[in-house]
Regions:
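RNA pseudouridine synthases
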Residues: 1-183, 187-189, 293-301
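Thr-Gly-centered strand-to-loop micro-motif
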Residues: 42-43, 99-100, 147, 198-199, ...
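Conserved hydrophobic positions within beta-strands
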Residues: 80, 173, 211-214, 247
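Active-site flanking residues adjacent to catalytic metal/cofactor-binding acidic residues
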Residues: 90, 238, 249
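The conserved catalytic core of RNA pseudouridine synthases
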Residues: 126-158, 166, 170, 185, ...
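Short, surface-exposed loop/helix-turn segments at secondary-structure junctions
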Residues: 199, 249-262
Length: 306
C-alpha cells in the first residue's frame, strides 16, 4: 500500500489526475478502474474518480496484484558493445521495445536477453523486467546497460539516482538552432490531459536538465548532441520541442507528417554511455555506432544543403 498526504499544490485536483501523476507507468483508465473497484481510499473512505482533493487529505492506494504472462526467451541477435559476469551493454535497434508490456510480449530486448543470458539477469525489477535498470524508447536506438546480478543492479540504480552515469545522445531536430550550445532546465511530468505524453507544463513535474550542442546545421534542420543530467521519460524529445525544435520524425511532440518518407519515429540515438563498473570501481564507457538509417539521413541532408 502507498500513502500520500495532500499539500496545497494538489488541493482541488481530481484524484484520478493526481494519482496518474504519481503512478507514471499506469494509464488514467487503469487508475479510474482501481478507484471504482475500491482500491483507493481518502481518509479511510472509498471515493469516486471525480473526487476533488482537499489540503491534508490522506490518500491510500493498494495496487491489485497483476497476473503476469510467462516471458519466453527468443533467439534475437544482439549487438553487444561490452559484456562480463556483471553487466552487458548493447546497441538497441530501432523498433525494439525494451521490456514486455501490453501489446508487446514478444520480440522485446528482454526476450532476447533471456535467450542470451539464461538465468544470469538481476531480479530486482521483477519477472517482466529482468536485468533492466534503465530504458530508451522503442524508436530510439543506441546504448543500454543491463545487469546480470542484483549487486550490479543496486550499484547502477544508485548511479542513476545521483546522476553520475554519463549519457550522450545525438539527434536531428527541426529548425536552425542559432546558438552553438545551450541548456534546457525545465521540469518534466505527465501531460495534464494526454496521459501518453510528457510535458514541461504540469503541476508535479520532476527536475530535468538537458545540455545540447550543435554538431552540424542543414538550413531547416540541425544535428545536435544532447547530454543528460537527469533521465526523465521522453526528456530530450520534450525539452527540444519546448524550445521550438522537435526531433525529426517525432509525431508525438513534433509535426504529424514527416518530410522524409519511410522514417519511423524520432531521430534519436543514445551514442555514449559511461558508468562506474559495479565490481572494479573503474570508469567504463561504450560508444554505439550510428544506425544505417541515421547515416543515410545525414548524407541526404548534406547533399540538400550543397
Amino acid at each position: 500500500m502507498k500513502e500520500f498526504s495532500i499539500d496545497l499544490n494538489a488541493e482541488g485536483q481530481r484524484i484520478d489526475l493526481y494519482l496518474s501523476e504519481q503512478f507514471e507507468d499506469k494509464s488514467r483508465s487503469y487508475i479510474q478502474k482501481i478507484i471504482k473497484d475500491g482500491y483507493v481510499k481518502v481518509n479511510q473512505k472509498p471515493v469516486k474518480s471525480n473526487y476533488r482533493l482537499s489540503f491534508d487529505d490522506r490518500v491510500e492506494v493498494t495496487l491489485p496484484e497483476a497476473k503476469e504472462p510467462d516471458i519466453v526467451p527468443e533467439n534475437i541477435p544482439l549487438d553487444i558493445l561490452y559484456e562480463d559476469q556483471d553487466i552487458i551493454m548493447i546497441n538497441k535497434p530501432k523498433q525494439m521495445v525494451v521490456h514486455p508490456a501490453p501489446g508487446h510480449y514478444s520480440g522485446t530486448l528482454v526476450n532476447a536477453l533471456m535467450y542470451h543470458c539464461g538465468n544470469e539477469l538481476s531480479g530486482i525489477n521483477g519477472c517482466m523486467r529482468p536485468g533492466i535498470v534503465h530504458r530508451i524508447d522503442m524508436d530510439t536506438t543506441g546504448s543500454l546497460v543491463i545487469c546480470k546480478n542484483d549487486k550490479a543492479h543496486q550499484s547502477l540504480s544508485e548511479q542513476l539516482k545521483v546522476h553520475s552515469i554519463r549519457r550522450i545522445y545525438v539527434a536531428i531536430v527541426h529548425g536552425n538552432i542559432k546558438e552553438d550550445s545551450g541548456t534546457v532546465n525545465a521540469p518534466v511530468g505527465r501531460h495534464p490531459t494526454d496521459r501518453k505524453k510528457m510535458s514541461t507544463h504540469c503541476k508535479n513535474g520532476r527536475e530535468a536538465i538537458t545540455h545540447y550542442k550543435v554538431l552540424e546545421r542543414f538550413g531547416d534542420y540541425t544535428y545536435i548532441q544532447c547530454e543528460l543530467e537527469t533521465g526523465r521519460t521522453h526528456q530530450i524529445r520534450v525539452h527540444m520541442a519546448s524550445i521550438g525544435h522537435p526531433l525529426l520524425g517525432d509525431e508525438v511532440y513534433g509535426p504529424k507528417k514527416c518530410p522524409f518518407k519511410g522514417l519511423q519515429g524520432q531521430t534519436l540515438h543514445a551514442r555514449t554511455l559511461g558508468i562506474i563498473h559495479p565490481s572494479t570501481g573503474e570508469y567504463l564507457e561504450v560508444n554505439a555506432p550510428l544506425p544505417e538509417y541515421f547515416i543515410e539521413l545525414l548524407d541526404r541532408l548534406r547533399n540538400i544543403c550543397r
